[in-house]
């Protein structure tokens, strides 16, 4: 998996068409209304639903007031530069409510739980779980077979573009409500205890805890048993 360069992300945002997409429920004498090809109109003679850019649909509503009895507009963004990731081809388990922006890479058999937020340029390795309400900022990178606990934050770095993003290596377990600051690398096989604030690199195969996080011990068999990654949670249905 390739991490996006910060300048690539900045260029993408700068050049992207800023959009305000809306869904509009509409009723009236719709046989008298003409809809342009840029607006998706699923309508019959009396009612229907429109999908499109607000700047275009607003004009239709204004110009056809005498034919439109009522309408309701659903809108969840304004001048948005980055669309949501198309999830249909992703070979991972992604639960409802997860917010995943375009240009995120998700490995096979990863798990993204409810209300996780994953920003542009983030990378999630195969078999890793991002738990409920966790946040992966721009360019944050999680290796294979990791667990990022509920409410954890991996800080994002898009500007300044020279800054190093958070890197979590393979087989890492990050507890609930952990904060990992920009530029930190969490080494392979490490465990970060719940609630820790990680300001410095974490050596491989160590346990860190506290605010700021400090090494409290090396990984031992007891720790391995308590932080085991269960592959059963990552299994998908066989492809048809």
Swiss-Prot record:
GO molecular function, one term: tetrahydrodipicolinate N-acetyltransferase activity
SUPFAM superfamilies given in the database record: Trimeric LpxA-like enzymes
Top-level enzyme category: transferase
Entry's EC annotation: 2.3.1.89
Catalytic activity: (S)-2,3,4,5-tetrahydrodipicolinate + acetyl-CoA + H2O = L-2-acetamido-6-oxoheptanedioate + CoA
The keyword Cell wall biogenesis/degradation belongs to this UniProt entry's keyword annotation: no
Keywords: Acyltransferase, Amino-acid biosynthesis, Diaminopimelate biosynthesis, Lysine biosynthesis, Repeat, Transferase
Domain of life: Bacteria
InterPro entries associated with the record: DapH, DapH_N, Hexapep, Hexapep_transf_CS, Trans_hexapeptide_repeat, Trimer_LpxA-like_sf
Pathway, per record: Amino-acid biosynthesis; L-lysine biosynthesis via DAP pathway; LL-2,6-diaminopimelate from (S)-tetrahydrodipicolinate (acetylase route): step 1/3
Record-level GO BP terms: diaminopimelate biosynthetic process; lysine biosynthetic process via diaminopimelate
HAMAP family assigned to the protein according to its UniProt record, in alphabetical order: DapH
Family the entry assigns: Belongs to the transferase hexapeptide repeat family. DapH subfamily.
Purpose: Catalyzes the transfer of an acetyl group from acetyl-CoA to tetrahydrodipicolinate.
PANTHER family: 2,3,4,5-TETRAHYDROPYRIDINE-2,6-DICARBOXYLATE N-ACETYLTRANSFERASE, ACETYLTRANSFERASE
Name of protein: 2,3,4,5-tetrahydropyridine-2,6-dicarboxylate N-acetyltransferase
Gene that this polypeptide is encoded by: dapH
